[in-house]
């Protein structure tokens, strides 16, 4: 009987460890050199190391290419770069169904606790999450004019928030 219990415990813990993991790309420290990230993550655009200026560039990836989390399978990951350094990242998803909450579920289980009001179907807005260190984390949920749900999760540092939301951000191809 003890062997049977041990067997089920081992199987249970193995499956939990296998299925619950955070997107490790989101753990990359803000300010990390993009050349280091290119060595670590397949699929990132190779940046020209001689192209250093103060322009903020936005690169758009399918989140599932850099994150294996099930909640992010239909999301996009926007990577913000200035002077060849990572200054922020944002997960975005547009749902046809107002009841979906993939980014909310991902955030709640992998990033931090959200305000209780964010769980409500009819709540729309932005919440700043408590974070360790210099990280500035925002979760946002909005209803579009055509009744779709737009969820975002921004991870950056407070020094870069204005740069990321600046109209001068250039979308890189």
Task: Please describe what each predicted stretch is.
Residues 75-80:
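Hydrophobic/aromatic beta-strand elements that line small-molecule binding cavities or substrate pockets
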